[in-house]
UniProtKB/Swiss-Prot annotation:
Highest classification ranks of the organism: Bacteria, Pseudomonadati, Pseudomonadota, Alphaproteobacteria, Rhodospirillales
Glutamine amidotransferase type-1 domain residues: 2-214
Gene3D superfamilies: 3.40.50.880
Organism: Rhodospirillum rubrum (strain ATCC 11170 / ATH 1.1.1 / DSM 467 / LMG 4362 / NCIMB 8255 / S1)
Subunit structure: Heterodimer of HisH and HisF.
A GO term for molecular function: lyase activity
Protein name, entry field: Imidazole glycerol phosphate synthase subunit HisH
Function: IGPS catalyzes the conversion of PRFAR and glutamine to IGP, AICAR and glutamate. The HisH subunit catalyzes the hydrolysis of glutamine to glutamate and ammonia as part of the synthesis of IGP and AICAR. The resulting ammonia molecule is channeled to the active site of HisF.
HAMAP family: HisH (MF_00278)
Length: 214
């Protein structure tokens, strides 16, 4: 199995690659983890991981700046329906648009907008950074197998995904109000938290992704 980790200048590639490799090894999954910005490499992948750090618009431009990359990702994820995982801004890019430093189009694969976090408690600082506990909205999802509600995972973000369809929100986190922590439909899943930084729970989610057959 070939897993493409997309290199477009906006992701924690080293830590994400190491987490994917460890999850595969510990989980007994035969997986080749390939960090790539090559369109043909993406088209040949069995699974795709899209990381992302920084501003929404910069990440979108980074993807668009690789000739044919957005089209290749759409072919693999939407047409061939191969498992796709977006991490942090990689998840946010699945939305219709982001409003960080203006209005910018997302990939539009899961309806919704990416908006600034505005906690009800003014004492809460932005960005939302550190460990926080997950609340599950979905009855079950394959990527959450073996992970209990209330499990702590690691976040660093100032913007959040507000889904058009609440049913696509798989998990939330409380930070002066509920924020989307995990989103998904069909073969697409995104996490606002960083599984590669979330220790045992993060490795479990990644291993689940590597075994996932949506």
């Amino acid at each position: 199995m070939r897993v493409a980790l997309i290199d477009y200048g906006s992701g924690n590639l080293r830590s994400a690659a190491k987490a994917l490799e460890r999850a595969a090894r510990d989980g007994g999954v035969a997986a080749e983890i390939v960090v790539t910005r090559d369109v043909e490499g993406v088209l040949g992948a069995d699974r795709v991981v899209l990381p992302g750090v920084g501003a929404f618009a910069n990440c979108r431009r980074g993807l668009q700046g690789i000739d044919g990359m957005v089209e290749a990702l759409a072919e693999v994820a939407l047409v061939r329906a191969r498992p796709f995982l977006g991490i942090c801004v990689g998840m946010q890019l699945l939305a219709d648009e982001g409003v960080e430093y203006g209005r910018h189009p997302g990939l539009g694969w899961i309806g919704g907008t990416v908006e600034a976090i505005s906690p009800a408690d003014p004492a809460l600082k932005i960005p939302h950074m550190g460990w926080n506990s997950l609340d599950f909205q979905a009855d079950s999802h394959a990527l959450l197998a073996g992970i209990e509600p209330g499990t702590h995972v690691y976040f660093v973000h100032s913007y959040h995904f507000r889904p058009a369809d609440p049913a696509t929100r798989l998990a939330s986190v409380e930070y002066g109000g509920p924020l989307t922590a995990m989103i998904g439909r069909e073969n697409l899943v995104g996490t606002q938290f960083h599984p590669e930084k979330s220790q045992a729970a993060g490795l479990r989610l990644i291993a689940n992704f590597l075994r996932w057959a949506p």
